């Protein structure tokens, strides 16, 4: 009996139990950004220690404008303001709750807007709720400052899912 207790105690002390560390997720987010912009993001997230994470993202969006001919949003000009970009985000955990966390996210992005290339810096907040299956619901407040073209600032809300693999 003493040997069994010693083995169990050694196992508990000798092994580390870190909840949520080194998890990997496929992420999908979609939402609206200011100034009349639709946005969709795909990504790969790798969790680090203490609730922090790194995410590699690919993003596509469209900034629509009114048609000068018909005076409203028409299908002929709706898809003219598209953009795409990709980036690397570091997500610092600000607060961990029982089944959720709040993170500060920031990092560089590179892409193109209607054929012109740009460099961007993204920052914002991310709230994640973890379901019992391991799937996460995320609510993201995004701020993006773009350089080298006219669409210089985007901010808004995105909602999405993170699926573990």
Question: Residue locations for each model-derived region?
Answer:
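Flexible, solvent-exposed loop segments that connect beta-strands
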Residues: 54-82, 112, 119, 139
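Short glycine/proline- and aromatic-enriched beta-strand/turn motifs that initiate or cap beta-hairpins
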Residues: 19-66, 162-164
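Short loop/turn motifs that connect adjacent beta-strands in outer-membrane beta-barrel proteins
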Residues: 19-23, 50-51, 94-102, 115, ...
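Outer-membrane beta-barrel "beta-signal"
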Residues: 86, 152-165
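Cleavable N-terminal export/targeting peptides
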Residues: 1-23, 165
């Amino acid at each position: 009996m003493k040997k069994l207790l010693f083995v169990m105690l050694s196992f508990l002390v000798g092994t580390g139990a870190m909840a949520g560390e080194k998890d990997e997720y496929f992420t999908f987010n979609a939402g609206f950004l200011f100034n009349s912009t639709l946005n969709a993001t795909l990504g790969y997230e790798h969790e680090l220690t203490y609730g922090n994470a790194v995410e590699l993202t690919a993003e596509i969006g469209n900034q629509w404008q009114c048609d000068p001919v018909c005076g409203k949003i028409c299908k002929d000009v709706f898809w003219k303001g598209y953009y795409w970009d990709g980036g690397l985000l570091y997500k610092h955990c600000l607060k961990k709750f029982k089944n959720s966390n709040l993170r500060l996210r920031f990092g560089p992005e590179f892409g193109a807007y209607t054929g012109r290339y740009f460099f961007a810096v993204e920052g914002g907040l991310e709230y994640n709720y973890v379901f019992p299956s391991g799937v996460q619901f995320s609510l993201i407040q995004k701020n993006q400052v773009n350089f080298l073209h006219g669409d210089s600032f985007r901010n808004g809300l995105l909602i999405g899912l993170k699926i573990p693999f």
